[in-house]
UniProtKB/Swiss-Prot annotation:
It is a multi-pass membrane protein. Pathway: Protein modification; lipoprotein biosynthesis (diacylglyceryl transfer). Keywords: Cell membrane, Membrane, Transferase, Transmembrane, Transmembrane helix. Coiled coil: none annotated. PROSITE patterns: LGT. One of its GO terms (cellular component) is plasma membrane. It holds the Pfam family LGT. It comes from the Bacteria. One of its GO terms (molecular function) is phosphatidylglycerol-prolipoprotein diacylglyceryl transferase activity. A 1,2-diacyl-sn-glycero-3-phospho-(1'-sn-glycerol) binds at residue 131. This is Phosphatidylglycerol--prolipoprotein diacylglyceryl transferase.
Amino acid sequence: MINPIALKCGPLAIHWYALCILSGLVLAVYLASKEAPKKGISSDAIFDFILIAFPLAIVGARIYYVIFEWSYYVKHLDEIIAIWNGGIAIYGGLITGALVLLAYCYNKVLNPIHFLDIAAPSVMVAQAIGRWGNFINQEAYGKAVSQLNYLPSFIQKQMFIEGSYRIPTFLYESFWNLLGFVIIMMWRRKPKSLLDGEIFAFYLIWYGSGRLVIEGMRTDSLMFLGIRISQYVSALLIIIGLIFVIKRRRQKGISYYQE
């Protein structure tokens, strides 16, 4: 089993979970800052946005998780802020981040569609890296299986939880996000292939589809009325993405992302 603490300096402990999230963030910001000027948004605007959005997204992700696990946290109030032990919901972070983005664009008089198009691929790669924090914390895993011989030994060992090997759903989602990132990065280079806003719509449809399937394999998901909450949200993302693309294609005068 991998020690969840990467470094320890006196009373200060740095967890792998935090390092995975921060590594994903750094790469995401770098990619977004390089792309932003092509759409008339300065790199400084990306950095300023992240300084506001990232801490709020972490808080939003934690609040989302705690709300749907309130039956546990009402008895363990001291653990509500213990995010180093895991327990942040990606959808909570995404919803919070999107709201902050809209407010930021309104305040700075920026085009939110352009901002979302720039952010979407970066979010994908950040999520792909961040999921490895779940791996080290032994969370976000799937049902018990007899063996995982198709995986490297270090993954097999870490996925041996409560006396059984577990489906590495973290790995599936990480790979799915990485594949989506590669596809959209290649696609957006082609002139007149994507309208403004369709990169973001692709993210909604791609991520929503993958998450909808992968959530069905998990055993530790938050539930509501017998269905996993993330599956409700995933279905909603797919619907929003499809409606957005259909309406966008019917509108006249919409510019292409890459002319």
